[in-house]
Amino acid sequence: MTAERIVEGVKESLGIMSDDTDINNQIRGKAIAVMNYINNGGGNITPENATEYEIQAIALGVNDLLNQNGSEFSEGFKAMAAQIQLRGGENDKI
């Protein structure tokens, strides 16, 4: 899986149909930021090993950033991120 597959997965999850370069770049940047946020808390997501669950978590975080819900991520994203972070580098992915 590549970074582009994560971008496409996030766009699909959010219902974004456009293939505009600027939109893709914005989604890519936010997806990388969310992935780094999860990884900095103990997660182990890479474009090569991202599961569907992890892509959905990234999409939820990207949605929060796009909607700028105050200064925090949503409770749903925090719960999904915590599950990924607790699992850490384990190979048994969801």
Segments (PLM) and residue ranges:
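Divalent metal-cofactor coordination and adjacent catalytic microenvironments
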Residues: 1-94
